[in-house]
Amino acid sequence: EVFGMDGSCRSDFDHRSVAHEVLKRVRLGRRIAKVHTGRMQVLFTHRGIMPLLMALQSALNGKTALEGASPLAGRIGQQVLDPRVCICDDPTVDWALGSCPIDGEGVQSRRTPLIEAGIVKGFYYDLQTAGRAGTSTTGNGFRRTGAGDYFEGQPTPALTNAMVAPGSESLDDMITSMDEGIIVDQVMGAGQGNILTGDFSVNVHLGFKVEKGKIVGRIKDTLVAGNAIETLNDVAAIGNRAERDF
């Protein structure tokens, strides 16, 4: 199963490009390639990297840090990731699905730097969590939005549009530079992990084998495991194209 998606508050976004990308991945997956167990280069697409970003999302939650359950608690100002990694939350992006003028507590929305040049700049907070931590809210207080529970419970820290700054390498150049490795494009669910340590373990739903800089086929029955913080501190390159995921 291969899927693609995009989203915007505008009605005129380019849906044809989504279909084109899906068809391209279908063609690449016609051959099956074998992959051996072991450590190797891994190229995560914007879809495949979600388990790592979810671990970071938990680690950067002010409530998680306040409770001492975050591996980044007490590490503001410290280098924890590769210097090329920059992450922010920005609810002011035009037409993005998570954009909003205020959060669920009436606080004006604003861009919040979380990781800059691999350094922890801060956490995201709601009013209550910020008060307990002795700091100011970042305008990230939201209630749950599941079916039937829009106004149940208190607001809690939540991200709006989490964004990873693009790097300098094209996807083709990154693939060409790989001697042997895999591309993780889609994963099955969020996998399993431990937010206390940043560990993750996830089954690859759609992935490809790379040999001598070329995609040689689709991989099956493959699991990728590691630690999100260690992985993002051992980066070979970051793609230069910003993509949206949900």
Where are these regions (language model features)?
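N-terminal small-residue-enriched
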Residues: 1-246
